[in-house]
Each structure stands twice: as structure tokens, then as C-alpha cells.
Amino acid sequence: MNYWIQHRLNCLEQAFNPKYCRALEHTIGIVARQFKAGNKLLICGNGGSAADAQHIAAEFVGRFQLHRKGLPAIALGTNPATLTAWSNDYEFETVFARQVEAFAQPGDILWGISTSGKSANVIRAMEMAKDLGLLTIGMAGNNGGMLKDLTDYPLFVSEYHTPYIQEIHLITYHRICEQVEAQLFAKAGLEAQIAV
């Protein structure tokens, strides 16, 4: 048990190296800037990454720690009718790209999550985002995989084991939510009471 915990901690320490932390700070900056400008965040992923997308959206729409107004974030895997209609009538590979096409406006951000870096529907969504001129955040293991060339703000780790990648992702997006919230609301003199 102690070995397992120590191994996990070692993986986290290796993942959050200076290069990754710099990329994380750049990502925090762009998310805060685009929210402040009135833009929204679209997020997509599959399986555990779809759950992460919902978690991120919930933290921004609701709150992370501060009592504040909601921020516009949409997880693209949450509408079963849209997902199944498009997948049944056309293809699963473009199920997120179609929603990006429908919802995105100039200045919005697409955040694609793929532990493998090769999820076809996330890649197609990122391609659509680039075609529409959106900013893109890519969060992946395997050093980014196929998301590399489609990502403006990369949050890539060299880890290959899915559970470890997911643990890194959780800490990463909690940090983003915390710092974006602090930048946009604590400095504005709004109530900064920690929510229970």
C-alpha cells in the first residue's frame, strides 16, 4: 500500500514539472481572459474524460470556492438526444465537431480531453475549432498524441497509464478553476468567502 501511494506521488511530481506548470499558468490566463471578454468554454471527451468535462463545466457554471456569478461552460457529452441522433444518422466521429459548429462563436475556447491523445471525435472537434478560428486547449497523456498540432494551449504529460493521467487531469483542472475564479472575482472586491 505504501509503495502504491509513493508511486502515485512520484508520478504527480514528475508530471507537474516546471514546463508543465508554465503551460498551466498560460492556460489559466487565456481562460480568464476569454471569460472576461464574454466568451464561453466548450469541453469534450469520452468516458472518464467526458465525466471530467462535466466536472469542469459544473465548477465554472456553479462555483469552485467563491460565491460569484456563473461562467459560461458547456460539456458537449451531456445531451443524449443529440449524441445518439447524430451518431445514429451520421457518425460518432463527428458528434462533438457538429456541436462545436452549432455553439461556437469567435473568441470561444474548445477544451479537448483525451487520455490517449488519439480519440477520433475529440480530434475532429479540435479540427472544427481550428477551422472556425477558436482557441484550443488540449489535455492528454502520451505527450499529446494526435492533439499536438491542433492545440494552442497544451497540457500534455508523458504518462501512458490512463488512471494516472486522469489523476493528473483532475489536479490540473481544479487548479485552473481555482485560479480563474480568483483572477476574475477575488480581485474585483466581490465576496471571497469559501463555499462549504
Curated annotation (Swiss-Prot):
Which residues does the UniProt record annotate as the domain SIS?
A: 31-196
According to the lineage, what is the superkingdom?
Answer: Bacteria
The record, for InterPro entries, names: GmhA/DiaA (IPR035461), Phosphoheptose_Isoase (IPR004515), SIS_dom (IPR001347), SIS_dom_sf (IPR046348), SIS_GmhA/DiaA_subfam (IPR050099)
Q: Give its E.C. classification number.
A: 5.3.1.28
Textual note on the cofactor: Binds 1 zinc ion per subunit.
Single annotated GO MF: zinc ion binding
Residues the record lists as binding substrate? N46, G47, G48, E59, N88, D89, S114, T115, S116, S119, Q166
Pathway recorded for this protein: Carbohydrate biosynthesis; D-glycero-D-manno-heptose 7-phosphate biosynthesis; D-glycero-alpha-D-manno-heptose 7-phosphate and D-glycero-beta-D-manno-heptose 7-phosphate from sedoheptulose 7-phosphate: step 1/1
Q: Name one GO cellular component term.
A: cytoplasm
A biological process (GO) of this protein is: carbohydrate metabolic process
Residues involved in Zn(2+) binding: H55, E59, Q166, H174
Cofactor(s) listed in the protein's UniProt record = Zn(2+)
Q: Is Transport tagged as a keyword?
A: no
Into which EC class is this enzyme placed? isomerase
| Reaction(s) catalysed by this chain's protein | 2 D-sedoheptulose 7-phosphate = D-glycero-alpha-D-manno-heptose 7-phosphate + D-glycero-beta-D-manno-heptose 7-phosphate
Q: Which UniProt keywords apply?
A: Carbohydrate metabolism, Cytoplasm, Isomerase, Metal-binding, Zinc
* Localisation per UniProt entry: Cytoplasm
Q: What PROSITE patterns does the annotation carry? A: SIS (PS51464)
| Additional free-text comment from the UniProt record | The reaction produces a racemic mixture of D-glycero-alpha-D-manno-heptose 7-phosphate and D-glycero-beta-D-manno-heptose 7-phosphate.
| UniProt record similarity statement | Belongs to the SIS family. GmhA subfamily.
Its function, per the record, reads: Catalyzes the isomerization of sedoheptulose 7-phosphate in D-glycero-D-manno-heptose 7-phosphate.
Would you tell me the protein name for this molecule?
Phosphoheptose isomerase
Question: Which organism does this record belong to?
Answer: Crocosphaera subtropica (strain ATCC 51142 / BH68) (Cyanothece sp. (strain ATCC 51142))
Lineage runs:
Bacteria, Bacillati, Cyanobacteriota, Cyanophyceae, Oscillatoriophycideae
